[in-house]
Amino acid sequence: RQMCIRDSCQDMGFNTVFLQVRPSGDALYKSDIFPWSRYLTGTQGTAPSDGFDPLEYAVNEAHKRGMQLHAWINPYRVTNSSNDNGKLAANNPAVSRPDLVLTDSSGKMYLNPGEADSIDIILEGIREIVRNYDVDGIHMDDYFYPSSGFDDSAAYFKYQDAYPNKADWRRSMVTTLISCARDAVKEIKPNCMFGVSPSGIWANAGDTPGGSNTNGSSSYHSLYADTKLWVEREYLDYIMPQIYWYNGQPNADYNTLINWWAGVCAPTNVKLYIGEAAYKAASGSEAAWKGQNGINELSNQVSMCRQSQYIGGCLLYTSPSPRDRS
């Protein structure tokens, strides 16, 4: 299936594949830090019986086709559901270091972003990938702090004198991970790219100076990810905001957001790519995404990006979407 996807991407003119290799505190590659993913064998920690290494295979096949391969990780997430909490392998960092686990109100588990040891584990995982695989980039998804209730008071207690505002402390800890992750990548392989695909809204102008003319959930307030600061300080080689809305959408207009991000990135050396909701085209619930409307919307969005001097490209999420809806 991987080969078919890469052939399809090559035929359609794509130049880069982003492969998710750490969905939830696990690995789709041989790792001494994270257990083998259950998505491979059905049981976390169980290696493929034939020695298959998905990341090694994907890198080789992408490079054969003249495409780049970026390894995509979810840095903090340990489980997607509380139903998975009892299915973790013994060598999962959340099992060996339960003191680092943060659980949200739905029961999902995360490595606590407020713990320095959590950051160290994530950084070692990044170094392991860059050392052992010829990847062209390390890519982080949009999951940072949980978006629902959690208790991180014990971690905050250690920092509260320096950070009287807990929200500022949380953002500072995530920013530390981002800046250190870039350094970790560049120390091993200077030409390897590092980027993030955050929520399309940094903050709304109505509640945060400098925010976009929107009114939706934001990375700054909901996930404690100061993505605008990361661009301004050039902690990233590129940023790829997930602008999964349509032109004219109330509270989160596509055109408004790509122009806002263009304005943020233009004075910097950070490249701007746009994450497109290919999975919605022809199948979304809103009228703008249904049937031919959705195909036209996606096509128009890609054209708008191509016309902007500040946007370097688009990523279509997810991989089967353009093929299935061609």
Range-by-range predicted roles:
Residues 164-209, 219-285:
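Glycoside hydrolase catalytic-domain groove-lining segments
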Residues 284-297, 319, 323-326:
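Aromatic-rich peripheral "rim/lid" segments of glycoside hydrolase catalytic domains that contact
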Residues 37-50, 106-120, 163-173, 242-247, ...:
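The substrate-binding groove and active-site-proximal loops of carbohydrate-active enzymes
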Residues 6-26:
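Catalytic domains of carbohydrate-active enzymes, especially glycoside hydrolases
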Residues 9, 61, 110-143:
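An active-site-proximal structural segment forming one wall of the substrate-binding cleft
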Residues 76-128:
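Active-site-adjacent "subsite" loops/lids of carbohydrate-active enzymes
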Residues 3-7, 317-324:
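Conserved small/polar residues in nucleotide/adenosyl-binding loops
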